């Protein structure tokens, strides 16, 4: 895809100076794939991950403003759903995430695949801990369960609820989106 779609020049127009990390083959999951960029993200800069199999109708500025609030270490964009194809978050009475689950509806708060970390180094630390503990789902290391490591360490994780989530990762989801989205 890198050469076929001229990704270097395309991404350079969208985000001048961006770094591109190419993947040679299949990894053991998205968390492993993200860590291929460890030398670029293991720092004190904010980090934002976005899955690529959804269409979102949202205000990214509102999300980032909410995530940058004092005392917040990490967060996620969420929507209401219960289908077990999503990741899910459970929150306490203060609105902080108490745990997340992959493909297990522990609540009706599903994650939209947009994940924020105030410091990239926190993500790297907790992703490596999760991998070291061999915490897998469907034999893969997913990104969302990394939050559980942070929560166990006392980090404050919050949600940002919205209504504009459209999954497009399967042919059925894409067809539904094309027929129903205006």
Where are these regions (language model features)?
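Conserved N-terminal catalytic core of the sugar/cofactor nucleotidyltransferase
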Residues: 1-46
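Conserved core of the sugar-phosphate nucleotidyltransferase
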Residues: 5-9, 57-134
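Conserved beta-strand termini and adjacent loop/short-helix elements that scaffold enzyme active sites
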Residues: 21-23, 77, 160-162
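Alpha-helical elements of Rossmann-like donor-binding domains used by nucleotide-donor carbohydrate transfer enzymes
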Residues: 35-36, 62-63, 146, 176
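Short, high-confidence coil segments that cap the C-terminus of an alpha-helix
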Residues: 44, 71-72, 155
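Short beta-strand-to-loop acidic/aromatic patch adjacent to the donor-nucleotide binding site
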Residues: 44-55
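Active-site glycine-centered loops adjacent to acidic/histidine catalytic or metal-binding residues
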Residues: 53, 80, 170
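Catalytic-core segments of class I nucleotidyltransferases/pyrophosphorylases
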Residues: 96-166, 172-175, 179-182
């Amino acid at each position: 895809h890198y050469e076929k779609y001229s990704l270097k020049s395309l991404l350079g127009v969208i985000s001048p100076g961006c770094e591109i990390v190419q993947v040679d083959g299949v990894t053991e999951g998205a968390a492993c794939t993200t860590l291929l960029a460890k030398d670029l993200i293991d720092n004190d800069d904010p980090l934002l991950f976005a899955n690529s199999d959804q269409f979102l109708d949202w205000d990214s500025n509102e999300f980032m403003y909410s995530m940058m609030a004092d005392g917040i270490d990490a967060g996620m964009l969420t929507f209401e759903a219960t289908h077990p194809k999503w990741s899910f978050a459970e929150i306490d009475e203060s609105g902080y995430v108490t745990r997340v689950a992959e493909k297990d509806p522990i609540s009706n708060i599903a994650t939209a695949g947009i994940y924020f970390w105030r410091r990239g180094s926190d993500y790297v630390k907790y992703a490596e801990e999760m991998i070291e503990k061999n915490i897998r789902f469907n034999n893969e290391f997913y990104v969302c369960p990394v939050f559980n490591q942070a929560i166990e360490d006392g980090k404050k994780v919050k949600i940002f609820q919205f209504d504009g989530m459209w999954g497009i990762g399967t042919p059925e989801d894409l067809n539904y989106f094309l027929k129903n989205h205006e």
